[in-house]
Amino acid sequence: MDLNERKIVVDLETLSTHSNACIVSIGAVLIENLEIVDTFYTNVNGVDGKKAGLHVEKDTLDWWQEQPKEIRDAWQRDPQPLDTALDSFSNFYGGSGSIWGYGANFDVVILESAYRALGKDIPWKFWDIACLRTLMNVLDKRLPKANNHNALDDATAQANMLLEILKS
């Protein structure tokens, strides 16, 4: 792995745990030359995802209801249409670099499902996908305890962990 290549760490908040979950927020951090150089955050209109056939799960909705109101309110502020959110994320991704999720079968897979649901091209290649959780498990690393469920805050914590690992 080229340590200086672009790396995009992404985190989502969703209304399901399925691979085709409805997205309500996208947070991402861009790393270049082992430094955080940019961030991305957008709330997403969940109704658009549902109309596109993305999954909403009762258990996840119930779980969200148990979270503090300010957490739920955060991703309901100024939601963008799903189409706009994905186009904005594609622009942020920039067409090259690895894309890192915290779990091999969650964030990146769900984003890909959303792109497909709208008939959009996925901006990365399958070989660009990397899993931070797997890397952390191999190295016996743990993320600091947090419970904010904010996609950008979580992506930032994950990016900082990735940098810690890459710099060691």
PLM features per residue range, with description:
Residues 3-8, 13-101:
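Conserved non-catalytic scaffold segment of RNase H-like nuclease domains
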Residues 11-13, 107, 131, 154:
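Acidic active-site catalytic centers that drive phospho-/nucleotidyl reactions
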Residues 16-18, 136, 159:
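Hydrophobic positions within alpha-helical membrane elements
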Residues 19-21, 115, 162:
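Short, function-defining helix-loop hinge/capping sites that tune catalysis or transport
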Residues 72-73, 90, 112, 159, ...:
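Non-transmembrane alpha-helical segments in soluble domains
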Residues 90, 105-126:
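Substrate-recognition/cap helix-loop segment adjacent to the acidic, metal-dependent catalytic center
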Residues 98-105, 109-110, 140-168:
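Acidic, Mg2+-coordinating catalytic module of metal-dependent nucleases/exonucleases
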Residues 123-142:
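Short, flexible loop segments at boundaries between secondary-structure elements
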